[in-house]
Design a protein with these regions (language model features):
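An interfacial alpha-helical scaffold signature
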Residues: 1-158
Length: 158
């Protein structure tokens, strides 16, 4: 819960930066770090694939100009999203199609696979929405002192 609150705060900070402000790199790094460090994330399962084939594949959706897999930083956020959507993500026997991905599976399987496929993610929604690529998330988290984009970034990471 504490990490989720910090993540929301980081996203809010990022959204307040004026266009052209170079601090976006730092803000992005902290969002990516908080997201990466969550013990588990939650996805909404595609109802059609679940009912017809029994597959638990995260739903791919659009939000304004962004398209990606919908991911939530807490179960409560995923639950509220499903509730607002009515029957779109609820089965006939009233099962809410919310899946959980634990940290290990997220790091070792989910992110690398979707980064390779060049997919995006939509984190949370509405005012807390943050959209980016799995590829960039993975690159930031694999970064170390040998992987510096420029001197300014190097100063931020120290």
């Amino acid at each position: 819960m504490d990490k989720d609150i910090r993540l929301v705060e980081q996203i809010a900070t990022f959204k307040r930066l004026p266009k052209g402000d170079d601090r976006w790199r730092v803000a992005f790094y902290y969002i990516a770090k908080e997201f990466w460090d969550l013990e588990e994330v939650f996805v909404i399962i595609d109802k059609t694939l679940y009912e017809e084939q029994g597959l638990k594949i995260p739903v791919f959706r659009e939000y304004k100009e962004a398209q990606g897999f919908q991911i939530f930083s807490s179960y409560n956020k995923a639950y509220k999203f499903v509730e607002k959507q009515g029957e779109l993500f609820v089965t006939e026997n009233d099962k809410k199609l919310i899946g959980r991905i634990r940290k290990g599976a997220f790091h070792e399987v989910f992110v690398p696979f979707f980064a390779e496929q060049k997919f995006n993610y939509l984190l949370n929604e509405e005012e807390g929405l943050f959209a980016d690529t799995f590829e960039r998330l993975l690159a930031v988290m694999e970064a170390d002192e040998e992987y510096i984009v420029d001197e300014e970034q190097e100063q931020y990471l120290k």
